[in-house]
């Protein structure tokens, strides 16, 4: 388990793009499971959509990417730097995510090449139901 201070020490994201509230499992270089509490106070709900707020799919994918970032953030052999999106594959959205939901995000490292390019498989669930899944690629920016 990681505290919020530890999460902030590992990820560069800050409000309003810090999308990991709590880490319940962290195995550097292998996998991580984290929680994102979805609240009506988040800025995206002002316009997505008035009267029927839905969490934008791109933010669910970003939350999965941040959990993936936690997997590589403490790997001792990797150079320090900023890992950014390099691509996404086979992302599917299964059901809407609304304020009041709690996303449980699981990611596992699939590959890491030349200490610069990697791929993770991610899933986001609400109350055990799959809401989003896909593969996310990242690369190290010097």
From Swiss-Prot:
The keyword Cytoplasm applies. Gene3D superfamilies: Hotdog Thioesterase. It is found in: Cytoplasm. InterPro entries: FabA_FabZ, FabZ, HotDog_dom_sf. The keyword Lyase applies. GO terms for molecular function: (3R)-hydroxyacyl-[acyl-carrier-protein] dehydratase activity. GO terms for cellular component: cytoplasm; membrane. Coiled coil: none annotated. Keywords: Cytoplasm, Lipid A biosynthesis, Lipid biosynthesis, Lipid metabolism, Lyase. NCBIfam families: fabZ, PRK00006.1. Involved in unsaturated fatty acids biosynthesis. Catalyzes the dehydration of short chain beta-hydroxyacyl-ACPs and long chain saturated and unsaturated beta-hydroxyacyl-ACPs. Belongs to the thioester dehydratase family. FabZ subfamily. This is 3-hydroxyacyl-[acyl-carrier-protein] dehydratase FabZ. It comes from Prochlorococcus marinus (strain MIT 9313). The lineage of its organism: Bacteria, Bacillati, Cyanobacteriota, Cyanophyceae, Synechococcales. The gene is fabZ.
């Amino acid at each position: 388990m990681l505290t919020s201070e530890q999460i902030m020490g590992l990820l560069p994201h800050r409000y309003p793009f810090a999308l990991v509230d709590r880490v319940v499992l962290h195995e550097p270089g292998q996998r991580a499971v984290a929680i994102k509490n979805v609240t009506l106070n988040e800025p995206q709900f002002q316009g997505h959509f008035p009267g029927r707020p839905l969490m934008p799919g791109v933010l669910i994918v970003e939350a999965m990417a941040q959990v993936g970032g936690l997997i590589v953030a403490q790997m001792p052999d990797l150079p320090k730097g900023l890992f950014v999106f390099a691509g996404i594959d086979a992302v599917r959205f299964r059901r809407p995510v609304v304020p009041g939901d709690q996303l449980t995000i699981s990611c596992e490292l699939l590959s890491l090449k030349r200490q610069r390019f990697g791929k993770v498989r991610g899933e986001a669930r609400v109350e055990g139901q799959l809401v989003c899944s896909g593969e996310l690629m990242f690369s190290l920016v010097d």
